[in-house]
Curated annotation (Swiss-Prot):
Lineage, broadest ranks: Eukaryota, Metazoa, Echinodermata, Eleutherozoa, Echinozoa
Family from the record: Belongs to the metallothionein superfamily. Type 4 family.
InterPro entries per the UniProt record, alphabetical: Metalthion_4_echinoid/annelid (IPR017980), Metalthion_4_echinoidea (IPR001396), Metalthion_dom_sf (IPR017854)
A Pfam family assignment: Metallothio_6
Described purpose of this protein according to its UniProt entry: Metallothioneins have a high content of cysteine residues that bind various heavy metals.
Organism in which the protein naturally occurs: Lytechinus pictus (Painted sea urchin)
Name the record gives this protein: Metallothionein
Keywords tagged on the record: Metal-binding, Metal-thiolate cluster
Amino acid sequence: MPGPDVKCFCCRDGKECACGGGECCITGKCCKEGDRTCCGKCSNAACKCADGCKCEGACACTMGNCTC
């Protein structure tokens, strides 16, 4: 699995958004400039999130720890 510096997944509106490098959830945005393709349910390398996870609000995790 690629490290977060290569590819990270950020939760937003129940979607999963792949970002090429850089920080994702820290800034409260799904993706940095560039790739904005969203697919699948909300999840990322750090945690498994419940439905309704958004970076702008609280992120309820069912496993692990979100930085959102």
